[in-house]
């Protein structure tokens, strides 16, 4: 829960992978009997990418290869692979293992593990990576967030079924070799809070040891994701102001020295709520309309977009922030 400061960390490489298949609102509205324009009005999403035959590990490996190339590095430079995703490819073995296999280094011995905090997984992985690198435990870490949300969406809940998209993103992080214009890339502040009173507001009950395959109580609907969007927003509003003030004093009513905000692309209303904090719209990066909510891949995929558009440059200070199932709140302030 504590907010630490100034751990050197360089995002040396960054990339994303989007499935080729684009699913438009018109397609979903026609297929599921929804009124024309309903999806955009309700969710803020205009299209989303969805897999055809791609697996989570395949998408993650594709993003990882490009991120390594972007960093000018190879897998021989990587000490640890962190799968930071909310949707596992299978229960056992861990998706990190499957990503390693997809990368073709199955005999290299690179440790591959997972960090699972649903939509906040990438932020938690960044924070943990900075700590591990600062401690000298690892030098360079490959973080992969890969999500096939479409596998567990319930068509009976159009507000959720139409909101989510599939995507993967990867980042190579390491200790910065030198400052840029006198500014050292670092995580300046990071904070996470969880309020388990909201545990049932965003949940997929099946797939674990409670509603297991041999449990006679298991029903098909237990394997679908359910989210009470208004309930999540209410809980976020209750704790959001205090959380932001703990992350950095003054953040609940302005951005002070923050150059850009990369929020989790949770929903139209979730993004709209950011205006209540006095954050200028020009400093907020949005990809919800074109990608949908891509769970843990949302923040790194949007970060990638900001860099490629030239909105985020070396030496800029950026806020990565959002919520995840739990309900969990997370925020990281870093110099890119």
Region locations from a protein language model:
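Short acidic, glycine/serine/threonine-rich loops at helix termini
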Residues: 22-23, 92-94, 126-127, 152-157, ...
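Short glycine-rich phosphate-binding loop at a beta-alpha junction
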Residues: 76-84, 255-264
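Condensing-enzyme catalytic core mediating Claisen C-C bond formation in acyl metabolism
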Residues: 1-53, 157-234, 238, 242, ...
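Short beta-strand segments
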Residues: 12, 84, 116, 141-147, ...
């Amino acid at each position: 829960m504590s907010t630490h400061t100034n751990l050197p960390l360089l995002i040396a490489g960054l990339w994303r992978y989007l499935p080729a298949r684009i699913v438009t609102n018109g397609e979903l509205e026609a297929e599921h009997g929804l009124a024309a324009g309903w999806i955009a009005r309700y969710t803020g999403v205009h299209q989303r990418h969805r897999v055809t035959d791609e697996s989570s590990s395949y998408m993650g490996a594709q993003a990882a290869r490009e991120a390594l190339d972007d960093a000018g590095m190879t897998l021989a430079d990587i000490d640890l692979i962190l799968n930071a995703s909310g949707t596992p490819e299978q229960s056992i073995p861990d998706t990190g293992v499957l990503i390693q296999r997809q990368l073709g280094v199955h005999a290299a011995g690179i440790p591959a593990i997972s960090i699972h905090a649903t939509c906040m997984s990438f932020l938690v992985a960044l924070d943990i990576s900075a700590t591990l690198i600062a401690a000298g435990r690892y030098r360079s870490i490959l973080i992969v967030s890969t999500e096939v949300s479409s596998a567990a969406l319930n068509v009976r809940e159009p507000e959720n079924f139409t909101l989510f998209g599939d995507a993967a993103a990867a980042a190579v992080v390491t200790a910065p070799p030198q400052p840029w214009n006198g500014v050292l890339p670092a995580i300046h502040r990071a904070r996470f809070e969880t309020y388990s009173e909201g545990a049932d507001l965003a949940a997929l009950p099946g797939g674990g040891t409670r509603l297991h395959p041999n449990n006679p109580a298991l029903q098909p609907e237990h394997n679908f994701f359910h989210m009470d969007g208004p309930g999540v927003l209410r809980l976020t509003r209750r704790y959001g102001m205090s959380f932001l003030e703990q992350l950095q004093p003054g953040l609940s009513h302005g951005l002070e020295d923050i150059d850009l905000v990369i929020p989790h692309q949770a929903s139209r209303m979730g993004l709209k709520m950011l205006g209540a904090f006095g954050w200028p719209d020009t400093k907020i990066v949005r990809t919800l309309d074109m990608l949908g909510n891509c769970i843990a891949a949302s923040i790194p995929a949007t970060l990638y977009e900001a860099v490629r558009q030239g909105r985020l440059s070396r030496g800029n200070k950026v806020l990565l922030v959002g919520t995840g199932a739990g309900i969990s709140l997370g925020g990281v302030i870093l110099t890119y």
